[in-house]
């Protein structure tokens, strides 16, 4: 599995919006952020520079790049952290997010199951007003999103 395949899968889930945030992070939301959606997965697209070949420089091992973070939920969080290659997600561990250090932590089918579960967990936590908005026809949803973004732009 890789970032492009996971991106295609995530965008195929219901009510998913993507947004670039915090540098080179592709963040996936259940419902658009403008209408109160919540994020459920994040792919780090940052490509670190190749290590220096200087003889006196030690390779950096403590700053392992995390490829993908997602909402695991309280029920699965501890069990997932026992799996090699999964760690608590920085800044998000307190809300039961895990992060993958490698793409081969799961098979393609397992990745899909994990991210589908993250989507479902997050969808269930959305406020009633946001869920009601997501139940509207797509054209109405888009109109509400555009209006919400206009209001946010006026405030800033």
Where do the model's predicted regions map?
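Charge-dense, helix-prone N-terminal extensions
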Residues: 1-156
């Amino acid at each position: 599995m890789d970032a492009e395949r996971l991106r295609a899968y995530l965008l195929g889930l219901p009510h998913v919006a993507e947004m670039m945030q915090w540098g080179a992070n592709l963040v996936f939301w259940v419902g658009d952020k403008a209408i109160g959606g919540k994020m459920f997965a994040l792919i780090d697209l940052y490509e670190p520079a190749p290590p220096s070949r200087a003889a006196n420089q030690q390779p950096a091992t403590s700053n392992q790049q995390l490829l993908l973070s997602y909402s695991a939920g309280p029920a699965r969080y501890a069990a997932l952290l026992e799996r090699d290659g999964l760690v608590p997600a920085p800044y998000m561990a307190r809300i039961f997010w895990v992060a993958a250090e490698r793409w081969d932590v799961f098979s393609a089918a397992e990745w899909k199951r994990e991210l589908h579960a993250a989507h479902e967990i997050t969808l269930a936590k959305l406020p009633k007003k946001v869920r009601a908005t997501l139940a509207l026809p797509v054209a109405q949803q888009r109109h509400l999103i555009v209006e919400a973004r206009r209001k946010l732009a006026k405030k800033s």
